[in-house]
């Protein structure tokens, strides 16, 4: 099995606590309201903490598909959240799982710095394609910006 790491960092004008609430605490309810392609997020097993399995149902290319996410870490104090895609339609054939390690910290002017490490655990030594990496980054950036936009549009949130 090969492991391929990718790191990304972005900033937001939203404070870490408010952004974490949207990205993690309320995400199961908020994401399907904000992202049209995502129909639902439901807990299949667990209580929301580490070890929980979530099913994310989405529409892609006119087809309804799903991903299974395993929660690896929830740290509400340090605004950290880690999870892995462990099954479903979002995994390329050459990938066993994709892990995401995210952390929000204080940024300039009361905003946030979001750091993300993505690890592709591949079958054999196959590296993820450039297309897979770019597509995943685009989806992640879109999700982040949509939730950030929701928080900015709802000051009482």
UniProtKB/Swiss-Prot annotation:
InterPro entries: Bet_v_I/MLP, Bet_v_I_allergen, Plant_def-hormone_signal, START-like_dom_sf. PROSITE patterns: PATHOGENESIS_BETVI. GO terms for biological process: abscisic acid-activated signaling pathway; defense response. Belongs to the BetVI family. Induction: Not induced during nodulation. Up-regulated upon pathogen infection. GO terms for cellular component: cytoplasm; nucleus. Keywords: Pathogenesis-related protein, Plant defense. The gene is PR10-1. PANTHER family: OS08G0374000 PROTEIN-RELATED, STRESS-INDUCED PROTEIN SAM22. This is Class-10 pathogenesis-related protein 1. GO terms for molecular function: abscisic acid binding; protein phosphatase inhibitor activity; signaling receptor activity. It comes from Medicago truncatula (Barrel medic). The lineage of its organism: Eukaryota, Viridiplantae, Streptophyta, Embryophyta, Tracheophyta.
């Amino acid at each position: 099995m090969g492991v391929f790491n990718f790191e990304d960092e972005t900033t937001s004008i939203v404070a870490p606590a408010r952004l974490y609430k949207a990205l993690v605490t309320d995400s199961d309810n908020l994401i399907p309201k904000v992202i049209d392609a995502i129909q639902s997020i439901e807990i299949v097993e667990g209580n929301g903490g580490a070890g929980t399995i979530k099913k994310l149902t989405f529409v892609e290319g006119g087809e309804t598909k799903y991903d299974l996410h395993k929660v690896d870490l929830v740290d509400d104090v340090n605004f950290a959240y880690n999870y892995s895609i462990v099954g479903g339609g979002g995994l390329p054939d050459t990938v066993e799982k994709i892990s995401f390690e995210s952390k929000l910290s204080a940024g300039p002017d009361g905003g946030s710095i979001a750091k993300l490490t993505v690890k592709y655990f591949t079958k054999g030594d196959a590296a993820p394609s450039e297309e897979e990496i770019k597509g995943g980054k685009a989806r992640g950036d879109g999700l982040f910006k949509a939730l950030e936009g929701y928080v900015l549009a709802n000051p009482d949130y």
